[in-house]
């Protein structure tokens, strides 16, 4: 379900998605597994659409069939420019991953939005192992060079993680 006011620089509305996949290893019969990926994004305009409180939550879970395993490159990861910005890309990896992003965005001037963000995330072997107390967190500031309808370039600077200060330079929106 997608009712954001605009896809590439949302200032109001929401996006909700659940994807389920089944992977079958036809060559070696070692890597048969299922994957679910659920994403929730909500954008709350404050007074006008020049200030926005944006929230994202994502749950990724893989389950291997009996006697099978999930290849490491298909395991959910947390850390990096789209999840936990105070940690390196792919910093945490396991069978289940969850993260939450909170951003306060405002228009500094017509071609530049700024953002303050707070991220939480974790990975675990099983969905049942997810605990709020195990979530890693970080915070930071972001700069989005944009047109009204699209983010052209963004710079995010993340603090608070064990990996030190992280800088991300991307030609894409955060979420």
Predicted regions and their residues:
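Core subunits and conserved enzymes of cellular information-processing
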Residues: 41-42, 139, 162
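C-terminal hydrophobic structural anchor segments
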Residues: 105-136
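C-terminal outer-membrane beta-barrel translocator/porin domains of Gram-negative envelope proteins
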Residues: 1-107
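Membrane-spanning beta-strands of outer-membrane beta-barrel proteins
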Residues: 33-35, 95-97, 136, 148, ...
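Transmembrane beta-strand segments that form the barrel wall of outer-membrane beta-barrel proteins
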Residues: 14-24, 83-90, 114-122, 151-161
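Outer-membrane beta-barrel "beta-signal"
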Residues: 143-147, 164-175
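Repeated loop/turn-to-beta-strand initiation elements of outer-membrane beta-barrel proteins
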Residues: 5-9, 47-51, 110-114, 145-155
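Residue-level detector of the transmembrane beta-barrel scaffold of outer-membrane proteins
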Residues: 15-17, 52-56, 101, 113-117, ...
């Amino acid at each position: 379900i997608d009712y954001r006011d605009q896809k590439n620089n949302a200032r109001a509305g929401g996006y909700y998605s659940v994807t389920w996949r089944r992977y079958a290893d036809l060559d070696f019969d070692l890597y048969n597994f299922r994957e679910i990926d659920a994403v929730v994004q909500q954008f709350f305009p404050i007074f006008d659409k020049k200030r926005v409180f944006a929230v994202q939550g994502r749950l990724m879970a893989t389950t291997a069939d009996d006697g099978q395993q999930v290849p490491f490159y298909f395991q959910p990861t947390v850390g990096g420019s789209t999840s936990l910005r105070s940690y390196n890309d792919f910093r945490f990896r396991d069978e289940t991953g969850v993260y939450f992003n909170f951003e306060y965005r405002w228009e500094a001037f017509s071609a530049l939005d700024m953002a303050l963000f707070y991220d939480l995330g974790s990975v675990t072997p099983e969905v049942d192992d997810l605990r709020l107390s195990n979530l890693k967190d970080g915070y930071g500031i972001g700069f989005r060079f944009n047109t009204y309808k699209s983010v052209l370039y963004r710079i995010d600077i993340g603090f608070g993680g064990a990996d030190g200060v992280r800088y991300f330079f991307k030609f894409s929106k955060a979420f």
